[in-house]
């Protein structure tokens, strides 16, 4: 699971990107954080799907 601080930073970088162009370092940080978030989401979602049991 991604920490609350990292999610807040992702959102902060998104707000900054709407106001101005991100620096190279900010862009790299944003890509890394987004990748980490998506990997955690997929892992969690996959776990939920694996626990689903169909009943007829």
Swiss-Prot record:
Location within or outside the cell: Cytoplasm
Q: Which organism is it from?
A: Alkaliphilus oremlandii (strain OhILAs) (Clostridium oremlandii (strain OhILAs))
Q: Which residues form a coiled coil?
A: none
Sorted keywords for this record are: Cytoplasm
The similarity annotation says:
Belongs to the UPF0291 family.
Top-level taxonomic group: Bacteria
Stated name of the protein: UPF0291 protein Clos_1191
Cytoplasm listed as a keyword: yes
